[in-house]
């Protein structure tokens, strides 16, 4: 065969092969490449969404942690205030109780002192009566002297 005819036949076969490839082989390959590109794009978009969701979740967690810390610090401050208030109330109550006990003790002491004075007055009156009786045995008027001693007792 002639080189020109062979070259011409090869060109026809080449263009036939190009046409066949473009008509039947290339569309499924292009479709597969497009699908693969779409999947990759979807994956990248999902990764980007995941990243932004993760960042938002991190921000929310940080906000919740800060809020939790604030609440805990408020609770601690309130507990400290309550404890200080309870201690102060206990001090005031103890102080008032001590004052009440001291006043009661003072009243008891005064009452006991009054009783002791009355007892001493009675004893002094009895001793005075006995002394006067022994001195004035001859002239004893018990009722008259008792009245005098009662007035004396009242004056003491």
Swiss-Prot record:
Organism domain of life:
Bacteria
Question: Which InterPro entries does UniProt cross-reference here?
Answer: ATP_synth_B-like_membr_sf, ATP_synth_b/b'su_bac/chlpt, ATP_synth_F0_bsu_bac, ATP_synthase_B_chain
Encoded by which gene?
atpF
Question: What are the record keywords, sorted?
Answer: ATP synthesis, Cell inner membrane, Cell membrane, CF(0), Hydrogen ion transport, Ion transport, Membrane, Transmembrane, Transmembrane helix, Transport
A GO CC term attached to the entry:
plasma membrane
> Per its database record, what is this protein's job?
F(1)F(0) ATP synthase produces ATP from ADP in the presence of a proton or sodium gradient. F-type ATPases consist of two structural domains, F(1) containing the extramembraneous catalytic core and F(0) containing the membrane proton channel, linked together by a central stalk and a peripheral stalk. During catalysis, ATP synthesis in the catalytic domain of F(1) is coupled via a rotary mechanism of the central stalk subunits to proton translocation.
Where does this protein chiefly localize?
A: membrane
Under what name is this protein listed?
ATP synthase subunit b
SUPFAM superfamilies listed in its UniProt record: F1F0 ATP synthase subunit B, membrane domain
TM stretches of this protein: 7-27
Q: What membrane topology does the annotation report for this chain?
A: Single-pass membrane protein
Assigned protein family: Belongs to the ATPase B chain family.
Localization per Swiss-Prot or TrEMBL: Cell inner membrane
**Whose protein is this, by species?**
Neisseria gonorrhoeae (strain ATCC 700825 / FA 1090)
Q: Name one Pfam family in it.
A: ATP-synt_B
Any one Gene Ontology MF annotation carried by this entry is: proton-transporting ATP synthase activity, rotational mechanism
């Amino acid at each position: 065969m002639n080189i020109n005819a062979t070259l011409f036949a090869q060109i026809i076969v080449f263009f036939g092969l190009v046409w066949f490839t473009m008509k039947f082989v290339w569309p499924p390959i292009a479709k597969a490449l497009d699908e693969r590109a779409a999947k990759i794009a979807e994956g990248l978009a999902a990764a980007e969404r995941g990243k932004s969701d993760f960042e938002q979740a991190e921000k929310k967690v940080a906000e919740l942690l800060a809020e939790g810390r604030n609440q805990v610090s408020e609770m601690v401050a309130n507990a400290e205030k309550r404890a200080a208030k309870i201690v102060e109330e206990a001090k005031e109550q103890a102080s008032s109780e001590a004052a009440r006990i001291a006043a009661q003790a003072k009243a008891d002491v005064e009452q006991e002192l009054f009783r002791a004075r009355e007892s001493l007055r009675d004893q002094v009156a009895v001793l005075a009566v006995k002394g006067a009786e022994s001195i004035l045995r001859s002239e004893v008027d018990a009722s008259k002297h008792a009245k005098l001693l009662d007035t004396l007792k009242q004056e003491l």
